């Protein structure tokens, strides 16, 4: 079968076959109007930290502009624990993010270590900066020191830092790193040793950009950007419109991912896992950025404008307002461009903590390359804004929190007849991309 025939077959199998179901919660503080049977939903795993390598706490210079994100207990839906499908009927499938695994992935060589991380209690990958620690805490400490970041605690500076909650407060996590013996000078000495090796081995963000070109990331964004000049106000229920837009965008999301540098070089099973883990945040980031031009609402890929008042009437006003204030408004305020959006979405895509991932180390390295390329881009493109890179990263915890909250409202059933989402993603990834 040639490429065009393969695409036609795939499109025919998908047309009219995507059905969605969902349950919308009521206003905050009230039980949802409809309780779906979620006994057989697949479950997102725990929301412990390390998801982006830093937590939702803000730097002191921006602490007044960021809003608290709910902790793991607040964001976890009680009905979304690991299920066992009933034998009487096919299980309903929730496209919930696979999320971080109970034990974040480490390089295979470290799996047999008997040490645990002194900071969060996770499995240690070795001794880093004087202390046995995991890759997540090691990376967090290194970034904090190298970028000379300053954090603020929203509570009383004694937050619990463990494997599940290490990402909740950056301030307390950093202080625990210091109290357990991590040495700032060890990070600085490490960087100096690298520089002394010579120009060919100097750590370089421009080198990272060569391997993770932002130009290619921008091309991926532009390739799937809906070409819509005018938007019309939605007439139907906003939830229905959002579901239909998500339905449509799930297909383009796969094509977007295949254009991100090195994604298709990963094992096919890992590609499925990464898309399944991040689909909701990736879609939310996309329509939030598209909505920068909207007034008091969001713009969907289907060409519809969903107004804030409609969302409140439908009972989803609280989460809708969070999207507008924590994502859309912040993106508008800093004039986030599409290259920056693409890089943030690539950070979400390359999630080394996704459950079941085999190429953990490779995915971690790809995420680090995206960070480095984004930092280099912001320094070059916006030299008058030295804090822009950090400001961009502060949108990630909000995106994560909102993504989890949305899953408490929207439950998507199986797609394409009886095929589960993993099968759908596998077919999309195996199918050659259409030529452009």
Swiss-Prot record:
**How does this protein lie in the membrane?**
Peripheral membrane protein
Highest taxon of the lineage: Eukaryota
List, as start-end ranges, the regions of compositional bias called Basic and acidic residues. Answer: 188-200
Output a single Gene Ontology CC term carried by this record. membrane
Q: Where is the NR LBD domain?
A: 209-432
Q: Where are the stretches annotated Modulating? A: 1-116
What tissue specificity does the UniProt entry give?
A: Expressed in the adult central nervous system where it is detected in neurons of all central ganglia, the neuropil and nerve bundles radiating from the brain (at protein level).
Q: Which UniProt keywords apply?
A: Cell projection, Cytoplasm, Developmental protein, DNA-binding, Membrane, Metal-binding, Nucleus, Receptor, Transcription, Transcription regulation, Vitamin A, Zinc, Zinc-finger
Specify whether DNA-binding is a keyword of the entry. Answer: yes
Question: Which source organism?
Answer: Lymnaea stagnalis
User: Organism classification, top ranks?
Assistant: Eukaryota, Metazoa, Spiralia, Lophotrochozoa, Mollusca
Question: What are the start and end residues of every segment in region (Hinge)?
Answer: 183-206
Q: List the disulfide bonds.
A: none
One annotated GO molecular function: retinal binding
- Provide the residue positions that the database annotates as binding 9-cis-retinoate: 290, 301
- What is the protein named? Retinoic acid receptor RXR
Compositional bias (Polar residues): 39-48
- Name the principal localization, coarsely classed: cytoplasm
